[in-house]
Amino acid sequence: MNRGLKHKILAVAAAVVLSITMLFSGCGQDSGADYDPLEGVSTITFRDDCGREVEIPETITKVAPSGSVAQMVLMTIAPETLVGLSASPSTDQLDYFPEYTWELPTFGQFYGSKANLNMEALIAAQPQVIIDIGDKKRTHKEDMDKIQRQTGIPTIFIETTLDKMPGAYRTLGYLFGKEEIGEKMASYIEDTVSYAANHAASINDADKKTVYYGTGASGLDCNANGSIQADVIDIIGAKNAVVGTDVSDKGGGTLVNMEQLYNFDPDVIVVTLDGIYSVIEEGDKSWTELSAVKNGNYYEIPGIPYCWLSGPPSVNRILGIWWLGNLVYPDQYDYDMVAKAQEYYKLFFDYDLSDDEAKAMLANSSLK
């Protein structure tokens, strides 16, 4: 699927203009006063993962995501229902999203360091339901009640920690009348996690490799042991190299210095697309004496349309399990990674990833 760059840029520009238009049209005092998403429709009572019982339309055709995780998950199972996005897609992402979504307005997100949810713009788009998806926070029930009270729109939470994710896809399949595809996605997730658990259990503790997961331009922001952003490392049977530091579940992670990194001296280094890979590849002296660099065990994490490991940590981690397992333990996780990527992209994005596209994604992400 090759679409012109000009077309993509125009689509993104249109989305920005539409978002601004909706922002100002929604700034009035009565932005949602005349909108009742339950008026004249059949409803059901849905119990969300906060334990809240919420009346929602029986047939859902218009949804607003509360943030980046919700956007990612909904984009895989019901993109046609989206009336807006938490953030506009980049030009690199557009090929993997339905063209309809390219010009949707943006609402921002409710949680996280970039929390900026624009209630007025969201209400102006008139969704039937606001869906929040992700890990459960201490104040989640109160937060969902607050959004629902402020917008007048039914708001539900669906939990997607890795063990809850299959159930989340089954729930979404039910809500959107897409039980068959929801079950396929749920089963794929279960099979992936089970495969990794079985192989991880076969690796002796003494043989477990340590992995450093660096983010950002310096490579010294990292996802430490215990962070949800780095849980794929543990799932495949490896160890997070960064221990004994503060842990952050935010995308920026934990900042370390080069002295600490040399003390950790990981067996494998993986960095995000915006990271330090090219600097390491060009022989930057501050990195050259690390064992992983001397042995050629440093890699770039594929990141289109989303980082395969986290950022945000969602269903993208499922592909990350296949990739990181194959990279760190190729004898145990023995399969064709190009074929695995194609399988995932077809199921979750309905996208026919070509051999050349997959190989390009993996160019800096395969065993040297």
Regions found by a protein language model. Name each.
Residues 1-59:
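Short, low-complexity disordered leader/linker segments with a strong preference
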Residues 38, 53, 142-221, 250, ...:
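Extracytoplasmic substrate-binding proteins
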Residues 39, 44-49, 57-92:
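Extracytoplasmic strand-loop-helix segments at the start of, or within, the mature domains
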Residues 49-51, 105-120, 246-258:
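Short helix-initiation/N-cap motifs at beta->coil->alpha
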Residues 62-66, 83-86, 129-133, 154-159, ...:
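Structural recognition of the beta-strand scaffold that forms the well-ordered cores
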Residues 70-125, 129-137, 241:
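A short, structured surface patch at a secondary-structure boundary
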Residues 111, 222-252:
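Alpha-helical, coiled-coil/dimerization segments enriched in small aliphatic residues
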Residues 125, 243, 247-300:
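A contiguous binding-surface segment within folded domains or other stable secondary-structure elements
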